[in-house]
A protein has these predicted regions:
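N-terminal accessory segment detector
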Residues: 1-123, 128, 139-153, 158-181
């Protein structure tokens, strides 16, 4: 007799989204305590979340600095269904992914956190995404983010040019540009 279990697609998605939600909860609580201790959250997340992203991106070199390849690779990942991804554009000059669901933002909102805190947690969690873009040799900009109150997350990948900021720098700049609108 086999101990192997089978799950429906819906059960699998619920479990994976639940795991992402648990991660979102401890991330929020951890940063709350770090803030109480006087730790600079950007520096802390750059040193941890950005490093986490770098550790996960070994396969991203196959993108060869091509934004469309980066978008396509992420679209083909296990996260496609979890984040309800849409591959909106795939060219050598631009790759665009749209996420129609974010289990992290969903959890932070369900925790009753204020909109400003959800937006800040979202931005800090994105250090990982910017690290992955660095590994792929492309730039990343978030045109929209569910955590900022937008309907979707829209990740826009463009070619990296000499003098472009690192992903960590881009994470801070991306937020400042959105806040300045």
């Amino acid at each position: 007799m086999s101990d192997k279990q089978s799950f429906t697609r819906e059960e699998y998605l619920a479990d994976v989204r639940g795991a992402n939600g648990t991660r979102a909860q401890w991330f929020a609580l951890m940063l709350e305590e770090a803030e109480k201790a006087g730790i600079d959250l950007d520096k802390f997340c750059e040193d941890t979340i950005y490093e986490f992203g770098l550790g996960r991106c070994k396969k991203y070199g196959v993108c060869e600095g091509n934004p469309g390849k980066m978008a396509e690779m992420l679209y083909g990942s296990n996260g496609q269904d979890v984040f309800e991804m849409e591959l909106a554009e795939k060219t050598d000059e631009r790759g665009v992914l749209k996420f129609h669901f974010c289990p992290l933002a969903h959890t932070w909102k369900a925790m009753g956190l204020p909109a400003e805190r959800v937006a800040e947690l979202c931005r800090l969690a994105c250090y990982s995404d910017f690290a992955r873009a660095d590994c792929a040799g492309v730039n990343l900009h978030f045109e929209n983010q569910i955590g900022r109150g937008d309907e979707i997350c829209e990740l826009v990948f463009t070619p990296r040019k000499d003098g472009d900021p690192s992903g960590a720098e881009a994470c801070r700049v991306d937020c400042a540009q959105k806040d300045g609108e």
